[in-house]
Amino acid sequence: MKPRHKRALMIVAALAVIGIAALLILNALNSNIALYVTPSDVVAGKAPQGQAFRIGGLVKEGSLKRDGLTVHFVITDLVKDIPVSYTGILPDLFKEGKGAVIQGNLNPQGEFIASEVLAKHDENYMPPEAKHALEQAQKNGSAK
């Protein structure tokens, strides 16, 4: 084989390896993306269908009910409420009236089945997107 053909073959092989690696990386990133929505968005039908997503808001006062490892509560943006079911150990800072971001899927009955629950870590912190979404939901709810 001529050196020119070897070089061309090496370039083609390198491009193929880079292309396959890029495809695998993009596929992995796409499967780990979880869109963020508010309870008002979910009620309005703006939640992604058939994929996991995140809901952020406040845990509604008086809604927390424990049944062994399964916990039922309501997440609210102070305009709309979504019932949530989670099986697992909740974070220590998870409390009623405090902010939370939950990841999971919506079942056909309208209950959010959480696979992960995150609680805000101090009384002053709220993720910027959660704060903005709560403000927007309150503004839209009071405008109606």
UniProtKB/Swiss-Prot annotation:
<dbReference type="InterPro" id="IPR036127">
    <property type="entry name" value="CcmE-like_sf"/>
</dbReference>
<protein>
    <recommendedName>
        <fullName>Cytochrome c-type biogenesis protein CcmE</fullName>
    </recommendedName>
</protein>
<dbReference type="InterPro" id="IPR004329">
    <property type="entry name" value="CcmE"/>
</dbReference>
<feature type="binding site" description="covalent">
    <location>
        <position position="121"/>
    </location>
    <ligand>
        <name>heme</name>
    </ligand>
</feature>
<keyword id="KW-0472">Membrane</keyword>
<dbReference type="GO" id="GO:0005886">
    <property type="term" value="C:plasma membrane"/>
</dbReference>
<comment type="function">
    <text>Heme chaperone required for the biogenesis of c-type cytochromes. Transiently binds heme delivered by CcmC and transfers the heme to apo-cytochromes in a process facilitated by CcmF and CcmH.</text>
</comment>
<feature type="topological domain" description="Cytoplasmic">
    <location>
        <begin position="1"/>
        <end position="7"/>
    </location>
</feature>
<keyword id="KW-1003">Cell membrane</keyword>
<keyword id="KW-0479">Metal-binding</keyword>
<dbReference type="Pfam" id="PF03100">
    <property type="entry name" value="CcmE"/>
</dbReference>
<keyword id="KW-0812">Transmembrane</keyword>
<feature type="transmembrane region" description="Helical; Signal-anchor for type II membrane protein">
    <location>
        <begin position="8"/>
        <end position="28"/>
    </location>
</feature>
<keyword id="KW-0349">Heme</keyword>
<keyword id="KW-0201">Cytochrome c-type biogenesis</keyword>
<dbReference type="GO" id="GO:0046872">
    <property type="term" value="F:metal ion binding"/>
</dbReference>
<dbReference type="GO" id="GO:0020037">
    <property type="term" value="F:heme binding"/>
</dbReference>
<keyword id="KW-0735">Signal-anchor</keyword>
<comment type="similarity">
    <text>Belongs to the CcmE/CycJ family.</text>
</comment>
<feature type="topological domain" description="Extracellular">
    <location>
        <begin position="29"/>
        <end position="144"/>
    </location>
</feature>
<feature type="binding site" description="axial binding residue">
    <location>
        <position position="125"/>
    </location>
    <ligand>
        <name>heme</name>
    </ligand>
</feature>
<keyword id="KW-1133">Transmembrane helix</keyword>
<dbReference type="GO" id="GO:0017004">
    <property type="term" value="P:cytochrome complex assembly"/>
</dbReference>
<keyword id="KW-0408">Iron</keyword>
<dbReference type="InterPro" id="IPR012340">
    <property type="entry name" value="NA-bd_OB-fold"/>
</dbReference>
